[in-house]
C-alpha cells in the first residue's frame, strides 16, 4: 500500500507514514487506493483482534508479514485489556447497543490505538536496530495511554508534557500509578 499527502506529494510506504505521522507539507496521509474489505468478514462473531487484522492488513500490505502482524496484534490486545475480546457491548434493546471502550490498562479509549501503535513502531525499530524518543503533549488521557503502552518497549523512550494545573484529574491519577 502506498500513501500520499492530501496536499499532493510523493508516495510513501506504511513504515514511512507510521513514523512521520503527518506529511511534511502539512497534509494528512491517505492511501493511494481504498481497499475493498468484505463486509461478511466483519460481523459480531469476529474477535477484536481478528477484526483489527482484517482491517489493517490491506493498509500495511507486504511491509509486515501476515504471521508477524497477527503476533503483534495478539500481544497488543490479549493481555492488556480486562474484557475478553477487548470491547464489551451492552444491548439495551434490538436497536440500541452501548459499546464500552474503557477496558484498557488506563481506562481510556485511546488504549485501543496506543497498545497497537507502539508494537508496530517496535516491529520496525527492532528490524533496523534503532531507538526513538517520543514527545507527547496533552492535558488528558493520551499521555497516560502512551506511557502505559511504551512500558514494554525496549526501543522507545517517552517524554510526556502536561500543562501545570490543566491536567484532567483521571489522567493525573493514572500517572501517579
Cite the ranges covered by each PLM segment.
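A glycine-rich helix N-cap at a beta->alpha junction
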Residues: 156-160
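Conserved small/polar residues in nucleotide/adenosyl-binding loops
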Residues: 167-174
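Predominant activation on well-ordered alpha-helical scaffold segments within soluble catalytic domains
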Residues: 19, 53, 57, 115-118, ...
